[in-house]
Amino acid sequence: MTPVASETCDVLVVGGGPGGSTLARQLTRAGLDVLVIDKQAFPRDKICAGWVTPAVLESLQLDRTDYAQGRVLQPITGFRTGVRGFDETETHYPHPVSYGVRRCEFDTYLLHRSGARLRLGESVKSMVRENGGWLVNNAIRTPLLIGAGGNFCPVARMLRTDPAAPETLVVAQEIEFAAGADEIRGCGVDPEIPQFYFCPDLKGYGWCFAKGNYLNIGLGREDSHRLSAHVEQVRRLAARARRHPGELSRKIQWPRLSDASCFAQNPG
């Protein structure tokens, strides 16, 4: 017996991140009935330092004045970089080259701005091809199904018939938390100049970034081998540079490796 769908749409977009929400907005503005489904409820956290370039904001047609109302939009006009055993280097630009955002705010803003209908907190568990369309979760019928779920998109996973191409695994640990003005000043981090500390083997880097009343500290590497040791190494380098003091270090509770975000990236 053919299941009876409880909902229909012209386009079903799987994944409510910036890619999915931007596509949904364009399709909705073209007059299509678009439904976005995502396994997470929004706002949700995303392991990411959280900055976007002016070119991205322009492509998204994002009104900076509107977005900055009650949200973090931190101009970035320079970078401070360092590698263990070498002096730090500071680079400055005459105008903002990027903007710091909080992903929980940024992604939610784009998703709700899209104008699409939303089914959040719901995973895609089944997809059946029938009658020239798709039946998803035995509940949603659509003629067009789009996977926008990133590296672990369920659409890509379910439809892939060939072995996946060799990929480079990138893992990251990150924390973002509210901090007082005194704590941010104590870090010695200028909000307009994020700090980068590269691993000695140059296979990854850590960062310390102040934006609004928040600090974002993290590290990403090409592989997970001894990730915690590399995190500690970068933390000590930043502490020696007085980029985050002892009392702040005690507030940082790094996620376990099993909680770290893993990104699969095809080197080709």
Q: Each PLM stretch: what is its role?
A:
Residues 11, 32-34, 145:
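Hydrophobic anchor at the start of a short beta-strand
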Residues 2-17:
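Beta1/beta-strand and adjacent pyrophosphate-binding region of the FAD-binding site
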Residues 152-235:
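Conserved FAD-binding catalytic core of PHBH/FMO-like flavoproteins
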Residues 28-47:
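Glycine-rich FAD pyrophosphate-binding loop
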Residues 65-68, 75-158, 166-170:
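Conserved N-terminal helical subregion
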Residues 123-126, 223-268:
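FAD/FMN-dependent oxidoreductases across multiple families
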Residues 43-80:
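N-terminal FAD cofactor-binding segment of flavoenzymes
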Residues 20-21:
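N-terminal Rossmann-fold NAD(P) dinucleotide-binding loop
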